[in-house]
Amino acid sequence: MDQQQTKTRGVADIVFLIDVSGSMAPAIDALKANIGTFVESLSKGDANNVSPVRDWRAKAVGYRDFEADTEPFIDNPFVNDVEALRTQLAGLQAEGGDDEPESLLDALFKVANMGQTDKGAQSLDPAKWRYRSDAARVVVVFTDASFKPAMSIPEARGGGIQDVTNAVINNRIILSLFAPDMPGYDELSQIDKSEWEAISYPGLDPQQALVKFTSDQTNFKNTLRQLAASVSKSAETIAL
């Protein structure tokens, strides 16, 4: 194995892309309370994760309806400290976005195209991905809503799911979706290496279902450990 491949293994940039419309407060609280479980499993390993990530950065990004809400996109810098990440999560306020659908495609497009640090740079830009061969890039989505089929951001106005798919693939991003069992998410989950946990319970609407999913502390901790193992596995793969 050459030096570049050895360098790449065990390195990951992770974006938690979270719907911060009004109904999402319980899910955000659950993430804030349990993010330490994710980071510990990611960086130290456990029974599910035998190849922990040795070098990680993460950030929490919020999105709402890009057409209806005054603050539709809440960005943060990449950090490599669990308390700093928890502080970012605490800063995401669940409000607005009362009417579905939300603007997930716009948010994904912006995150995918945030740019990358120059190859061989001596320092990392906290506003950009690492250079593509230096780290796995993972975007973890939490939402309880459907999404608009067309984007409204100026740089991609009128674009749809195929444009987002292209952006995700071209920027070497792996998607992990925690989202309702609704049309559209199956299409996103078909992007290479993507995963979709369809959140659904008999008799519950999507908002109630995500509350139930995240409020079961034992199961949610296990979910985050499994997510950490999945991210670690992605970080084992060489990003070309």
For the regions a protein language model found, what residue spans apply to each?
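Divalent cation-coordinating acidic motifs and surrounding scaffolds
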Residues: 1-240
